[in-house]
Curated annotation (Swiss-Prot):
This is Nuclear import protein mog1. InterPro entries: Mog1, Mog1/PsbP_a/b/a-sand. Its main location: nucleus. GO terms for molecular function: guanyl-nucleotide exchange factor activity; small GTPase binding.
């Protein structure tokens, strides 16, 4: 189990993930992990103020669109938007919680570049566990660059076979982290 937020939470990660805080400064409300493998995944866990469920989608969809805005994404599509069951975040069973999940893709320019030809398609998986008693959304996102996908796919089934293993790895990673996430010290929300 990997300690998060000074040990206030912990979660299980697949092998080969590096804590990005050893490379650069990370905001206090975030934990960022980079994968050292061919999939090149990034996992971000954020503690954010709880938002009310939007009328036009899930809390996870709201955060997906917020990520698209932060990424200055030129295109975005949501493939799946669903609720999470208690089994999906079983490490939080002792907490009053709800969850939602989004899978999608964004076309993102490389940082500092404005040339649309330098844009990359990134599959983005977002799971949100809302801790009602603490008015907090725990936002878990996995970013998976799709190097062989030339346009934003309208569905996960339209991703080329050469990028399917990346999508599978991203899905397995977010499920593993979300399912294993445990709140150890509730004072993190004080």
């Amino acid at each position: 189990m990997v300690q998060l937020f000074g040990g206030a939470l912990c979660a299980d990660f697949p092998p080969k993930f590096l804590d990005a805080s050893v490379l650069r400064q990370i905001p206090d409300n975030q934990e960022v992990f980079l994968q050292d493998s061919k999939e090149n995944l990034t996992v971000i866990i954020e503690l954010l103020e709880k938002i009310e469920k939007p009328f036009d989608g899930s809390v996870a969809a709201y955060h997906f669109n917020s990520i698209a805005f932060d990424n200055d994404a030129s295109q975005r599509v949501i493939w799946r938007d669903k609720s999470l069951g208690e089994d999906d975040f079983e490490g939080m069973r002792s907490e009053k919680a709800s969850g939602s999940s989004v899978q999608g893709c964004q076309r993102v320019l490389e940082k500092g570049k404005r040339n649309p030809e330098s844009a990359t398609n990134v599959a983005i998986f977002v799971n949100v566990i809302t801790l009602i008693d603490f008015q907090t959304d725990i936002v878990i996102s996995v970013n998976a660059p799709l190097p062989n996908t030339s346009s934003v796919p309208s569905s996960v089934e339209n991703i080329p076979p050469s990028d399917q293993s990346i999508v599978r790895a991203a899905l397995e990673t977010i499920q593993r982290v979300t399912r294993s996430l445990v709140l150890v010290d509730k004072t993190v929300f004080a």
